[in-house]
Amino acid sequence: RPPGSEFGTYYWNENGERVTDNLEGDDSRVMMDRVIPFIEKAAQREQPFLAVVWFGSPHRPHRAAGRFRKMYSDQPKHMRDFYGEITGMDYAVGKLRRGLRELDMHEDTVLWYCSDNGGLKNESSGGRGRKGQIYEGGLRVPALLEWPGNIDGGRTTEGPGVTSDIYPTLLDL
């Protein structure tokens, strides 16, 4: 199978064409290598943009980039890839934040980072259930919201949230 198609999933560009190049390695890098140029084009045209980036990491099959896997050489192999994917995703989010600063767009750009589901089996999200279940523990998601020019940092809320809250919250901003 070609890279990126392990689950019958493929990458597509903005023209609806299947992408087949630059798919080797960590999924987070693959995604960010496409998002940054998209944002740069919007900046050149001085147009608002919406970029929704759904990272496949960290999901099975876990395949971290070598440099991130090496950081966890003291761990069992399956955990090296798992932790390496998380590190790769962190690096990709950092690359996005740096890119926004370099384009002088960070003050006017809402960056919303959240999970797609609740916690794993051995974790507690403060509610009944876990990932894959329709109880609060499977639906409640951790999230970070950053909008430097408009929202003061350092605030937290204990209010529950789900991914379906994103759209109405953005409209309310």
Region locations from a protein language model:
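A long, amphipathic alpha-helix that forms part
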Residues: R29-A43, F68-T109
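Short glycine/proline-rich turn/loop motifs
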Residues: Y11-T20, K70-H78, E146-I151
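A structural signal for well-ordered alpha-helical scaffolds and beta->alpha junctions
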Residues: S28, M32, M89, G137, ...
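Structural recognition of the beta-strand scaffold that forms the well-ordered cores
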Residues: F49-W54, T87, V110-C114, A143-E146, ...
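Histidine-centered active-site microenvironments of extracellular/periplasmic hydrolases
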Residues: P61-R63, R98-R155, V162
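Non-catalytic, well-ordered alpha-helical segments in soluble enzyme domains
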Residues: G94, P148-G149, T157-L173
